[in-house]
């Protein structure tokens, strides 16, 4: 497909799924002939492309079993690495005593530094995946994740633990960075919503489940056991993924096909239909610049990434403070406090069910009604999802402040889980649909913003609550979230105009 923000169209009668399956055959361009104005494509005989729209080697045409197996493997990895971001949080109190840490900022940072790895990882991983393909990047990052997690388990002091956590986050950012790209490789637009829902479960449910398991592990075995369990689980998933994850990136597959045909035929003039003509060094540099360029040249990418970053920051602020809130306000034990995270988990599952059941159906309904598929058709569910976020913060903050029954603030956090899941899913599918060719890059830009907020915002949490209290502290966050509620409406109305405006075109 050509560079740009929309999937290029050929004519009004060609479906989006057929355009994606045909690949560059549809992009060579129509030639106007004299016989009645009919159009015919002229194909270079040295151009190596898919063997027609139904080529089984094209990941869009893989069997359902193969797609589901790959998606489940990617979803498992995407669940595990965010799980590692928060599983350690309930054991921080033990670590503080073991390492004689007196700084509250440092005790928060040892949790959130993992997300700094999420910030820098995508800037390297996304270009590598678009240069060398998805498969090898997954495998290398999975192995590195296991190594750094084991290092965390044996960290001798706080400084080394911070460093090891950073590198674990760096490697662990892989599935969050290129997972959406893998799904875009395998699923056409009208099937993408359900697959994206399965993949998105990890980054949102993983951090919620982590503290529940981590609290009981820390109480029973000590804080290091969080890392032992993570390393064992990651090792098992890494081994299974060696067999279940196959290369799905079309440019890489066509490049391999081209090399094979060159060897078989001796025709060195053969070239991939998706070959840009750039050297690997040029491609890598372009790919590194691409996420940053998309982030700062496209208002859509910037504002939606900022919004998701704010919500993700709120999530991790809760992770680093909810333990002290329920221990101080409600006298919960270390084990019991882990259960307070279940409100976020239940809310996220509700949000996942709602968006998974409606995203593709709504897209197809609006497309049938209006005669074409638009990325903006992913946005309507985001309106109620955005409203749930400030409701959650107001409810959680004031009920915890006045020490109402403990179930009420937990119910309040469930609204954050629901709103967060719906918002994250709508934003992810919208960006992937709008930037399908560069799905990994646009999600890298989104992940960087999201992770930066998740790493830094929790550092301000303890002082904010100390100055403003639980009520007004969370209300401040709620008012900020309330201001962002206008975004889905703005992009529903003006999104297409912004995407297609020459002023905001992102070219490479």
UniProtKB/Swiss-Prot annotation:
Bias (Basic and acidic residues): 35-46
TM region positions: 73-93, 108-128, 143-163, 166-186, 197-217, 225-245, 299-319, 335-355, 379-399, 407-427, 435-457, 475-495
Paired cysteines (S-S): none
Disordered, as annotated region: 1-60
Membrane topology, record value: Multi-pass membrane protein
Phenotype of null mutants: Leads to a decrease in benzylpenicillin production.
GO MF annotation list: transmembrane transporter activity
Any Pfam family: MFS_1
CDD domains: MFS_Tpo1_MDR_like
Domain of life where this protein originates: Eukaryota
Family: Belongs to the major facilitator superfamily.
Descriptive protein name: MFS-type transporter penM
Organism listed in the record: Penicillium rubens (strain ATCC 28089 / DSM 1075 / NRRL 1951 / Wisconsin 54-1255)
Source lineage: Eukaryota, Fungi, Dikarya, Ascomycota, Pezizomycotina
């Amino acid at each position: 497909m050509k560079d740009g923000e929309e999937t290029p169209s050929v004519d009004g009668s060609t479906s989006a799924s057929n355009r994606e399956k045909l690949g560059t055959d549809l992009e060579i361009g129509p030639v106007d002939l004299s016989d009645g104005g009919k159009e015919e494509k002229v194909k270079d005989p040295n151009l190596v492309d898919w063997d027609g729209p139904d080529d089984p080697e094209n990941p869009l045409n893989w069997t359902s079993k193969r797609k589901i197996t790959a998606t489940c493997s990617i979803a498992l990895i995407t669940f595990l690495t965010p799980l590692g971001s928060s599983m350690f949080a309930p054991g921080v109190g033990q670590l503080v005593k073991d390492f004689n840490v007196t700084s509250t900022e440092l005790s928060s940072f040892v949790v959130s530094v993992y997300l700094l790895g999420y910030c820098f990882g995508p800037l390297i991983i996304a270009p590598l995946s678009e240069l060398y393909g998805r498969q090898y990047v997954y495998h290398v990052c999975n192995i590195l994740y296991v190594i750094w997690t084991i290092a965390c388990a044996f960290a001798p002091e706080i400084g080394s633990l911070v460093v090891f956590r950073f590198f674990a986050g760096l490697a662990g950012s892989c599935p969050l960075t290129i997972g959406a790209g893998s799904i875009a490789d395998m699923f056409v637009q009208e099937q993408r919503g359900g697959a994206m829902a399965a993949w998105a479960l990890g980054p949102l449910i993983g951090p919620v489940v982590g503290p529940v398991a981590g609290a009981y592990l820390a109480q029973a075995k000590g804080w290091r056991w969080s890392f032992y369990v993570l390393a064992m689980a990651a090792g098992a998933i890494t081994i299974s993924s060696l067999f279940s994850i196959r290369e799905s990136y079309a440019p890489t597959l066509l490049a391999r096909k081209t090399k094979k045909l060159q060897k078989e035929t001796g025709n060195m003039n053969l070239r991939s239909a998706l070959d840009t003509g750039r050297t690997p060094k040029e491609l890598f540099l372009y790919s590194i610049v691409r996420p940053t360029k998309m982030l700062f040249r496209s208002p859509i990418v910037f504002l939606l990434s900022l919004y998701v970053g704010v919500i993700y920051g709120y999530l991790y602020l809760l992770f680093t403070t909810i333990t002290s809130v329920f221990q101080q306000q409600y006298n919960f034990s270390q084990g019991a406090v882990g259960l307070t995270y279940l409100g976020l988990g239940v809310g996220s599952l509700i949000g996942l069910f709602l968006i998974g059941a409606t995203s593709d159906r709504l897209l197809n309904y609006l497309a049938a009604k209006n005669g074409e598929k638009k990325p903006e058709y992913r946005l309507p569910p985001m309106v109620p999802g955005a409203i749930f976020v400030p409701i959650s913060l107001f409810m959680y903050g004031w009920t915890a402040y006045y020490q109402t029954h403990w179930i009420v603030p937990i119910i309040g956090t469930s609204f954050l889980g629901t709103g967060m899941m719906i918002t994250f899913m709508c934003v992810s599918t919208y960006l992937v649909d709008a930037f399908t060719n560069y799905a990994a890059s646009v999600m890298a830009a989104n992940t960087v913003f999201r992770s930066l907020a998740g790493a830094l915002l929790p550092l301000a949490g303890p002082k904010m609550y100390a100055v403003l209290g639980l009520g007004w502290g969370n209300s401040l966050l709620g008012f900020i979230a309330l201001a962002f509620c206008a975004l889905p409406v703005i992009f529903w109305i003006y999104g297409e105009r912004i995407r297609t405006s020459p002023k905001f075109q992102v070219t490479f």
